[in-house]
């Protein structure tokens, strides 16, 4: 029959609603037949078979009666009214099954409302894809038939009958589908999704055969559910917007796989337990211990190169997570300190400012104005210490710093009678007085030389140098002259450094104190820096040509870093021009001098004192300063490659020992930062806890596994380098006495072979800690370090350690006791030092050369070339192949002082059988 075929054809749309394609022009009647049957069967399976059949018969009778009664009225209506009537009946039937049964007889009333429905359906199209496509299907199918066929009574009655039957059956089917979903346990929120999944299964066959058609309006589904479950119809609107279109469900789980894929890419670059933000991880991420074997295969030696060092920004700010830490402005934007003002607004004078600052002596508890503390402060104090003193309002007197040494000296006369000691002292003074008088008499005959000799004897007795012009004495003497030597009381020898000699004096270049010196890894270059804001590079004579060729190679190729600073270009050009000269212009008398007398190059750019230096394995150099910046240099370039800005003074820096694309910086702002040089950013950072957050030292240990920092209050804090998380800490202090309060940490040096670290502090102590249990392995005493940034370091074979001192001596200890020299000694205490006196000011830095054979070969070969007299050293050279001398018993030592003098020592120990 025509009505049945029309109903079957129109019923194709509800099942095809989920296909989402464009609808065809032709009639999908064949497909609609199978679809209607599937929907009907699905509804019957739920268990409501009988009520549906009865509902069909009742509704059909009422439809026929209403059609006969109103047939004349229907003929007078417009075609579009008939078209919209089907939609009104569908909405009425969906809203309430009772209305669908009783109100169908009132067709004229329904037709009056049909004019509003198309506009409302158009609004629904923009809200939901399902609603839009279903509405289009309901509009188009009846209107197409109406336009193509002539309008007659029979056709319109048939269309009305089929449309009404369709709406009723559609409502019944949707109710049954919803009930089936409810039986399966869906809640209010999950019902729309369950209905979607159910329709997907029911119409699988249609999706395979039928062409793609637009989905239809699904607004009736939530309304029916709401009307059957709750009498209040206020809830249905939210569910109407809740169910998402069918296409999104497959796309909703799609994003998680993409995220997991990106995370897996990052996981391949780090260990699984690293908890680092993804923005901090790059393709060239920091090597970890677990990645060592894999990275060795891919990139045997990850290192920094000039291309990556010069790429990107020239000035990098210390921004963590995209913003300046703690909301502070970056260093380049920080305004200079404002001069304090009085209550009336007048600027205070320098005297008023100094008088207003009260500082406290930590040893005595005395508080004095800063203006009166100058005479009580230790001589040679550095500007960093003064800055910390102003911030902490604390200081340590020079006498208190030597308190333990005084106790040691006071313990000496306890073994002897006080009267006898006084008597010996008086006799010594009388003897010295006679010696001085005799020297005056000899001066008339032999001149000033005898006086200087007597003065040197006096200084050796008293270990003092008041008004002693020893520097002028040294200038007129050969560099092979032995220096003053002293040893600890009770240390009777044999000594290892009593025959040490000065072989070169590099004074006259630095204008002011030298705060730090560092050798390159190969031992051929020495970097020194300090108070004059300039970094100087000293090259060995036998390595000058190599580095000069390297520099000329880059200059001739025109490989200049982009936008170098003008002050760096101008200054370095003049400096390097004077330094670029042949190695034959040196003084022929300085045959034993290992370094060229003038610096290989000078790097200018810092605007305040330099505090620390660090070399990479391929000749990159980092310098940190009190101007709150870290600058990157390379030995082949004249200009600064990059500038890393900080918030406060940068007290310590260190290249990562295994991957020099990263470096560590410690600052007085309390933050430890791990910088990525190629990416020009802070890769990781952490902040020190506690009241005093001043970081005064930093380094790596265990071959880069841990980063260690030292603080002003005497703590050594360890961080896991992989993600810079806190690991453990050591409180560096004595158990009793004056040093039970932690003092400033000035240096941290690893002892690679034995898993230990060497810690220098301002309590005039050097401590060796075992990292396996954080126990104290050895404590070294004897030197004076109460307020300086003096730090101790190891010799090339870790047999000795050396440190400068505020008493103008260089102190050397054996790392471990030679038990053959002592009958009874504490294994965890080392008071047996050897001292060298070669400076007339505070020795601010002292280091061993990492490769002394490079320097000794020059010395020995020059002696061999003379051929006049063969020394024992030359005989040793003959016994060794390729002209390289054995260095097992030889050390090269360098020291710098508060006046800028740098001296080079060579020590050749006696052969021990």
From Swiss-Prot:
Residues 119-184 form a coiled coil. Phosphorylated by ATK1; the phosphorylation stabilizes its interaction with RAB11A and RAB11B. Residues 1-24, 205-348, 397-424, 459-480, 557-593 are annotated as: Disordered. Residues 211-257 are annotated as: Important for interaction with ARHGAP26 AND ARHGAP10. Residues 334-347 are annotated as: Important for interaction with RAB11A. Residues 262-278 have a biased composition (Basic and acidic residues). A motif (FFAT-like motif) lies at residues 9-15. The modification Phosphothreonine is found at residues 158, 219, 271, 349. Changing residue 342 to D: Phosphomimetic mutant. No ciliogenesis induction in serum-starved conditions. One of its GO terms (cellular component) is endosome membrane. GO terms for biological process: cytosolic ciliogenesis; negative regulation of cilium assembly; regulation of vesicle-mediated transport. Residues 233-256 have a biased composition (Pro residues). Residues 2-170 are annotated as: Binding activity. Keywords: Acetylation, Coiled coil, Cytoplasm, Endosome, Golgi apparatus, Membrane, Phosphoprotein, Repeat, WD repeat. Pfam families: WD40. WD repeats lie at residues 509-548, 605-643, 645-685, 690-729, 740-779, 784-823, 876-913. Residues 280-311 have a biased composition (Polar residues). It is found in: Cytoplasm, Cytosol; Cytoplasm, Perinuclear region; Endosome membrane; Golgi apparatus, trans-Golgi network. The keyword Acetylation applies. The keyword Cytoplasm applies. The modification Phosphoserine is found at residues 3, 27, 50, 66, 71, 81, 96, 126, 262, 342, 344, 403, 470-472, 561, 565. Downstream effector for Rab11 which regulates Rab11 intracellular membrane trafficking functions such as endocytic recycling, intracellular ciliogenesis and protein export. ATK1-mediated phosphorylation of WDR44 induces binding to Rab11 which activates endocytic recycling of transferrin receptor back to the plasma membrane. When bound to Rab11, prevents the formation of the ciliogenic Rab11-Rabin8/RAB3IP-RAB11FIP3 complex, therefore inhibiting preciliary trafficking and ciliogenesis. Interacts with the GTP-bound form of RAB11A and RAB11B. Interacts with GRAF1/ARHGAP26 or GRAF2/ARHGAP10; the interaction connects the endoplasmic reticulum (ER) with the endosomal tubule. Interacts (via FFAT-like motif) with VAPA (via MSP domain) or VAPB (via MSP domain); the interaction connects the ER with the endosomal tubule. Does not bind to RAB7, RAB10, RAB14, RAB35 and RAB8A. The FFAT-like motif is important for interaction with VAPA or VAPB. This is WD repeat-containing protein 44. It comes from Homo sapiens.
């Amino acid at each position: 029959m025509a009505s049945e075929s029309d109903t079957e054809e129109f019923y194709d749309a509800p099942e095809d609603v989920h296909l989402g394609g464009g609808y065809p022009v032709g009639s999908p009647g064949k497909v609609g037949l199978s679809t209607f049957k599937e929907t009907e069967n699905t509804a019957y399976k739920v268990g409501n078979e009988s009520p549906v059949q009865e509902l069909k018969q009742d509704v059909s009778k009422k439809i026929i009666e209403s059609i006969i009664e109103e047939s004349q009225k229907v003929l007078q209506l417009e075609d579009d009214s008939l078209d919209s009537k089907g939609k009104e009946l569908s909405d009425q039937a969906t809203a309430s099954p009772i209305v669908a049964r009783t109100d169908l007889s009132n067709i004229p009333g329904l037709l009056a409302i049909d004019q509003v429905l198309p506009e409302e359906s158009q609004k629904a199209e923009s809200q939901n894809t399902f609603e839009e496509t279903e509405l289009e299907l309901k509009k188009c199918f009846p209107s197409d038939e109406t336009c193509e066929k002539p309008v007659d009574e029979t056709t319109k009655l048939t269309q009305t009958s089929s449309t009404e039957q369709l709406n009723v059956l559609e409502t019944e089917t949707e109710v049954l589908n919803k009930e089936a979903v409810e039986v399966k346990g869906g809640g209010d929120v999950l019902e729309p999704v369950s209905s979607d999944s159910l329709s997907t299964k029911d119409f699988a066959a249609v999706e395979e055969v039928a062409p793609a058609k637009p989905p239809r309006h699904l607004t009736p589904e939530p309304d029916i559910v709401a009307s059957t479950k709750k009498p209040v119809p206020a809830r249905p609107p939210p569910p109407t917007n809740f169910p998402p279109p069918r296409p999104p469900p497959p796309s909703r789980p799609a994003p998680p796989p993409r995220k997991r894929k990106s995370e897996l890419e990052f996981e391949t670059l780090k260990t699984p337990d690293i908890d680092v933000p993804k923005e901090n991880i790059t393709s060239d991420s920091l090597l970890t211990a677990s990645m060592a074997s894999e990275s060795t295969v891919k990139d045997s030696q990850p290192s920094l190169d000039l291309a990556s060092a010069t790429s990107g920004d020239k000035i990098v700010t210390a921004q963590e997570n995209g913003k300046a830490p703690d909301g502070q402005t970056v260093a380049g934007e920080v305004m200079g300190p404002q001069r304090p003002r009085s209550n009336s607004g007048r600027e205070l004078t320098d005297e008023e400012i100094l008088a207003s600052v009260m500082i406290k002596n930590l040893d005595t508890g005395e508080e004095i104005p800063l203006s009166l503390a100058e005479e009580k402060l230790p001589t040679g104090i550095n500007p960093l210490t003064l800055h910390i003193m102003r911030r902490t309002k604390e200081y340590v007197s020079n006498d208190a710093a030597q308190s333990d040494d005084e106790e040691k000296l006071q313990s000496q006369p306890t073994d002897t009678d006080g009267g006898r000691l006084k008597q010996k002292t008086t006799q010594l003074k009388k003897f010295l007085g006679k010696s001085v008088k005799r020297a005056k008499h000899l001066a008339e005959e032999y001149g000033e030389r005898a006086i200087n000799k007597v003065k040197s004897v006096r200084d050796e007795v008293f270990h003092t140098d008041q008004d002693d012009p020893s520097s002028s004495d040294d200038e007129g003497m050969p560099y092979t002259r032995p220096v003053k030597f002293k040893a600890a009381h009770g240390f009777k020898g044999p000594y290892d450094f009593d025959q040490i000699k000065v072989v070169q004096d590099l004074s006259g270049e630095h204008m002011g104190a030298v705060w730090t010196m560092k050798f390159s890894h190969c031992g051929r270059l020495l970097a020194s820096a300090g108070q004059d804001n300039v970094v100087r590079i000293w090259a060995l004579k036998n390595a000058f040509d190599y580095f000069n060729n390297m520099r000329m190679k880059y200059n001739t190729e025109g490989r200049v870093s982009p936008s170098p600073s003008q002050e760096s270009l101008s200054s370095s050009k003049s400096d390097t021009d004077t330094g670029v000269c042949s190695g034959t212009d040196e003084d022929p008398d300085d045959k034993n001098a290992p370094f060229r007398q003038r610096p290989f190059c000078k790097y200018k750019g810092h605007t305040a004192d330099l505090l620390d230096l660090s070399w990479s394995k391929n000749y990159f150099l980092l310098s940190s300063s009190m101007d709150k910046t870290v600058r990157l240099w390379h030995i082949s370039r004249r200009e600064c490659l990059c500038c890393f800005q900080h918030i406060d003074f940068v007290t310590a820096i260190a290249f990562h020992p295994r991957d020099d694309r990263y470096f560590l910086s410690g600052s007085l702002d309390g933050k430890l930062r791990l910088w990525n040089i190629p990416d020009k950013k802070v890769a990781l950072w952490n902040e020190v806890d506690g009241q005093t957050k001043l970081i005064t030292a930093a380094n790596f240990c265990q071959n880069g596994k841990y980063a260690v920092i030292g603080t002003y209050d005497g703590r050594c804090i360890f961080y896991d380098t992989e993600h810079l998380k806190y690991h453990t800490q050591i409180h560096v202090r004595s158990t009793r006495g004056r040093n039970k309060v932690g003092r400033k940490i000035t240096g941290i040096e690893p002892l690679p072979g034995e898993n230990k670290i060497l810690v220098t502090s301002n309590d005039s102590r050097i401590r060796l800690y075992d990292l396996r249990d954080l126990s104290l392995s050895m404590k070294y005493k004897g030197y004076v370090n109460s307020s300086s940034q003096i730090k101790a370091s190891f010799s090339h074979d870790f047999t000795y350690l050396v440190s400068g001192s505020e008493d103008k001596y260089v102190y050397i200890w054996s790392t471990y006791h030679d038990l053959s020299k002592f009958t009874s000694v504490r294994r965890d205490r080392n008071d047996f030092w050897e001292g060298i006196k070669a400076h007339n000011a505070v020795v601010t830095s002292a280091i061993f050369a990492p490769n002394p054979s490079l320097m000794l070969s020059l010395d020995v070969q020059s002696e061999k070339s003379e051929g006049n007299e063969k020394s024992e050293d030359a005989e040793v050279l003959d016994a060794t192949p390729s002209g390289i001398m054995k260095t097992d018993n030889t050390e090269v030592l360098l020291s710098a002082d508060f006046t800028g003098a740098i001296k080079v020592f060579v020590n050749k120990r006696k052969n021990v059988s």
